[in-house]
Amino acid sequence: MKFAPLKPKFFIFFLGLFLSPFFLSAQGFESWKDLHIYYKKNNFDPSTITEEQLKYLPILSNLPPDFDELQDVKLKKKLFYLITLPIIHESNRLILEDREMGINIEKKFLRADLNENEINETVRLAVKYKLDYSTIDLRLFRDLKQRINIIPVSLALAQAIVESGWGQSRFALEGNALYGQWTTNEQK
């Protein structure tokens, strides 16, 4: 994360960059009621969730198809929180992997010990995080460290709430876009 305020367009892109690969498992939830039963059975509650429990929260492939039919606002917010929380944590975990890789490659760069794979990985990171990689130098590694950092959970959650209206927006329900991302490409 940049230490300067993120521009909204960049922030949405940044979250969208990590959001799509993490919808891994629908866990067979065909309705919000099934999801609610699962959360209740496993004692998943936003106000008391632990780091250990986070490991067992499913990462959904989409919102339950009837999520917009849920009328209880308090329950809707609770479910939305539990739906988005594992996505945010998994995204941050992968961002930290990229950051650590960049830092480790920088250490080898400082020792003038980069191999071809590390150069390719540096370029991959620069492309992924939209940085100029025409010259692999200290500036690039500084920019990588500045750009590649976790997104505070509260900020990512707030962004999902604002962009999707607690999962009620058309983009969220029809396009599975909790962060307002969209494309005109029919294949994506």
Can you annotate each of these PLM segments?
Residues F22-L157, V162-K188:
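Catalytic cores of secreted/periplasmic lytic hydrolases that degrade extracellular macromolecules
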Residues M1-A4, L17:
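Generic N-terminal simple sequence motifs
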